[in-house]
């Protein structure tokens, strides 16, 4: 079979195959040997699949079903992540930042705890508090800032029990924070500076998306 979660030119790798995993680990370690300090690990929750191949009800205009129906709630991904950590990251004391969305509070220590899979993961919960519908890229703007603020405070309290997260306001999948939170008539140096101050004053590791450092809008 041929499976692609993203572009059709970008096949998913079969992590159930030990030989495939070994090749992945070889490549990671090769880059670490070149002097890299760590990795941002993209879409990592997609590596484990439901391979029962049950028929899925189409949920899109193209007659296909969302791929997350076979990747969203699959047990056993932790075995792969811990193996990769022990084989590739621990020996180099590497910094690892996982793109792991919708990690529930009860399993958060497995991801960022003292013996977690990663050094940290991105703090997506506040960013998804204001999304519209099931599509994580579907937003209305400008958004009431207090909703994001309250969700951020709540998330900070939860995360502090387990470790720390990589804090973001925007990325390549989401609107610019300046456009999302700041009404057009209030757009300027002081409002943009206030938005930037927040991410640097949160507990955790601040991440800036390209253009955010100059207050870029959509």
Give, region by region, the residue ranges found by the protein language model.
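Active-site and adjacent substrate-binding regions of carbohydrate-active enzymes
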Residues: 1-218
């Amino acid at each position: 079979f041929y499976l692609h979660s993203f572009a059709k030119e970008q096949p998913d790798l079969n992590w159930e195959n030990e030989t495939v995993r070994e090749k992945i680990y070889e490549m990671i370690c090769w880059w670490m040997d070149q002097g890299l300090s760590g990795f941002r690990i993209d879409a990592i929750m997609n590596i484990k699949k439901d391979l029962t191949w049950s028929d899925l009800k189409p949920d899109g205009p193209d007659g296909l079903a969302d791929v997350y129906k076979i990747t969203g709630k699959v047990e056993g991904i932790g075995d792969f992540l811990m193996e990769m950590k022990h084989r590739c990251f621990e020996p180099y004391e590497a910094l690892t930042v996982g793109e792991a969305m919708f990690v529930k509070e009860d399993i958060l220590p497995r991801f960022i705890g003292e013996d977690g899979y990663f050094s940290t993961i991105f703090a997506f919960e506040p960013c998804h508090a204001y999304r519209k519908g099931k599509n994580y890229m579907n937003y209305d703007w400008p958004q009431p800032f207090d909703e994001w603020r309250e969700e951020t405070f709540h998330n900070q309290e939860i995360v502090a029990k387990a470790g720390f997260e990589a804090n973001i306001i925007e990325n390549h999948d989401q609107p610019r924070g300046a456009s999302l939170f700041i009404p057009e008539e209030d757009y300027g140096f002081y409002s943009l500076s206030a938005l930037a101050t927040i991410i640097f004053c949160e507990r955790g590791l601040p991440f800036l998306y390209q253009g955010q450092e100059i207050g870029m809008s959509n």
